[in-house]
């Protein structure tokens, strides 16, 4: 319905939003029916412009610093009021949505956007409930005003844009930016703060389930394979990015997928390919003269995206929930070419590698990245989104693994035979074969070889995988150079881990420099 006075459109349909976006010049229709929108100079998240309001109710529980920057309550009130005044005479789009597919752990949220395509994104990525807010919880508010220009000296921001979370008032303000991923990550951060207090582990992971009800989780930073590997034609998708793990099961925090599109192919990623159709939002994807998307074109950004609802996936778990996971996979993209394609972790090693979050920024989702690929340590495989101290999440992970008996694996989707530029990246079929072996239970109680420097147990055989690939030293022509790189990586792990206050059992579970 539309409010004729203020031109406010409540809970608009997909078709209406696509029509509005085209009429208002916000995007273009592609040959496959998707809507392409461009986000201007900000083609990724803006971590330097993300703040949390520092107020008494939550201040003691947040790890303040460069990731979670403090914002004054008074400054927030002023900025919120200025944005509301800015939007007062604008045509707006509003939906009542939910975040969290669990009937106990959802958060209701009213999303107000200046752009039609942002509203379509929100309706694709959040959950459209059959009945809004059944438990009558206090409702969160998101306001997204991309055309509002922040003034640092007036507003207390760092630039002309800001993303601000206010836990006390249940408000999220997005001003001055068009990149839609900020909306979903803001509510992910909200749930990452709220869920641990309810005994639930929030996770930056994808999840799927087999025909027998066996759940697998895939942790990893953007570009390491979460979406690709969980979109398995033989299994049912729960979700591709954000989940909660409660006693008794896992649930999707979202209602859609936000898949990277760079180099997307029908052959390697058929599930994602088929999901891109009418109703999908394509961010910063370039088209040819016939409006056919060119997924190889990175002229606007490496971080091209497709946002679509889970309903676009044929093989999915319709309630967005699953049993507790038998297998947990940590996806790492090792640019040094040192890590094996798969390692079997003890629970102490799981805690160590969860806290370390070693991986790479692949076609980084953050603006201002100087290099397309660089190694990084990202706590909990998602440091930018976790407001509480890392130990809170690591303890919850250990607790869940122990109580259910999940087996954790470290899977390298990065390089072998040498570092990036010399070695070659593991291809998707090889990694898929490893994942198949993991989910089938093949790698439980198998013969392993121990890699001393890395302190990892590696299986000697995996069905469908060349055995020479399993021990990384075999893929390097210069064995001495491999040993040198392995020592360098072990030293980097040790240096990064020094900041954590953990038990000796966990500290000793890491690589040995």
Curated annotation (Swiss-Prot):
CDD domains recorded: PEPCK_ATP
Pathway info: Carbohydrate biosynthesis; gluconeogenesis
One Pfam family from the record: PEPCK_ATP
Gene3D superfamilies on file: 3.90.228.20, Phosphoenolpyruvate Carboxykinase, domain 1, Phosphoenolpyruvate Carboxykinase, domain 2
One cellular component term from this protein's GO annotations in UniProt: cytosol
Source species taxonomy: Bacteria, Pseudomonadati, Pseudomonadota, Gammaproteobacteria, Alteromonadales
Binding of ATP, residues: 185, 204, 220-228, 269, 305, 431
Record: residues binding Mn(2+): 185, 204, 241
EC code(s) of this entry: 4.1.1.49
Family indicated by similarity: Belongs to the phosphoenolpyruvate carboxykinase (ATP) family.
Organism of provenance: Shewanella oneidensis (strain ATCC 700550 / JCM 31522 / CIP 106686 / LMG 19005 / NCIMB 14063 / MR-1)
Compartment(s): Cytoplasm
Enzyme class: lyase
Quaternary assembly: Monomer.
Annotated substrate binding sites: 45, 179, 185, 305
Protein name in the entry: Phosphoenolpyruvate carboxykinase (ATP)
Molecular function as annotated in GO: ATP binding; metal ion binding; phosphoenolpyruvate carboxykinase (ATP) activity
Cofactor note: Binds 1 Mn(2+) ion per subunit.
Gene name linked to the record: pckA
Keyword entries, A-Z: ATP-binding, Cytoplasm, Decarboxylase, Gluconeogenesis, Lyase, Manganese, Metal-binding, Nucleotide-binding
UniProt keyword annotation of Acetylation present: no
